[in-house]
Amino acid sequence: MLVKIGTRGSKLAVVQALEAKQKLLDSFPNLSIEIVKIKTSGDKYANANLAEIGGKGLFIKEIEAELLENNIDMAVHSLKDVPAFFSWGLTIPCVLERLSPCDAFISHKHNSLESLPQQATIATSAIRRKVQLLNFRPDLNIVPLRGNVTTRLQNQSFDGIILAEAGLIRLEKHHLITEVLPPKVMLSAVGQGAICIQCRRNDVKIIDLLEKINNNMSFIGVKSERSFMKTVNGSCFTPLAALAEYVSENMLYLRCMLADGKNIYFTERTSFIEDAEKMGMDAGLELKSKCL
């Protein structure tokens, strides 16, 4: 059986697609798998502000189109790039084991975020990061930074930059990290650190394959986070964050953040994994009511 996996062409995206390929081959050694690189709008406008050109869905739109046209069988995405609502007719039956959901501070000049001098310049284009950085250090000067991970790492004109730790691990760049930021300083993006695999909702054969390699603990955790995002109708324009962590085999601890331009709000709660989705929705309703 030939399976075509669609992915963006960036180095990180290809590494993630290869990870998914290996997981499939470990479980189904007789599969023949082809990686298909697809250029997305997010790649074409690599230096533009995502919120201004249409949001993070630009990283998956063209890949979803290839899925819907039956040109590929499945698509591998960074889950944090998948918007709250994606194309009708598609589903995500699989999330691979999640790596660190944390953000990392990288600096060639300073030892930590806290030790930065007054008015230091930090580069990041994520509004979620900007809001939380200024909540931690209101004096900081936050400037935009776009491009792939390699491009961002090459830019040394700032006091520091913020990147996802998981991406650096996958690219074997973890040694460049100055400081891993704890959730109390920088709560992560929904799904950060997780790779998801998307396919057609009616493709039973592919769904069966993907369910075999799904990491159920990661799947349930990110389901709670995405439920929060859907409830607040979050997008690239919305400063939001959520992180679900296991406190026991069957209990999740969820922390969420939502900002409205004036204030930043946090909430937390714990529930059994069976109620993960409801917990995310309840958190979303609470914070949404505060932002009205």
Curated annotation (Swiss-Prot):
Any one cellular-component term (Gene Ontology): cytoplasm
**Enzymatic reactions:** 4 porphobilinogen + H2O = hydroxymethylbilane + 4 NH4(+)
Part of which pathway? Porphyrin-containing compound metabolism; protoporphyrin-IX biosynthesis; coproporphyrinogen-III from 5-aminolevulinate: step 2/4
How does the cofactor bind to this protein, according to its record?
Binds 1 dipyrromethane group covalently.
Coiled coil spans: none
Q: Which InterPro entries match?
A: HemC, Porphobilin_deaminase_cofac_BS, Porphobilin_deaminase_N, Porphobilinogen_deaminase_C, Porphobilinogen_deaminase_C_sf
Q: Anything further noted?
A: The porphobilinogen subunits are added to the dipyrromethane group.
Q: Under which name does UniProt file this protein? A: Porphobilinogen deaminase
Species assigned in the record: Wolbachia sp. subsp. Drosophila simulans (strain wRi)
Taxonomic lineage? Bacteria, Pseudomonadati, Pseudomonadota, Alphaproteobacteria, Rickettsiales
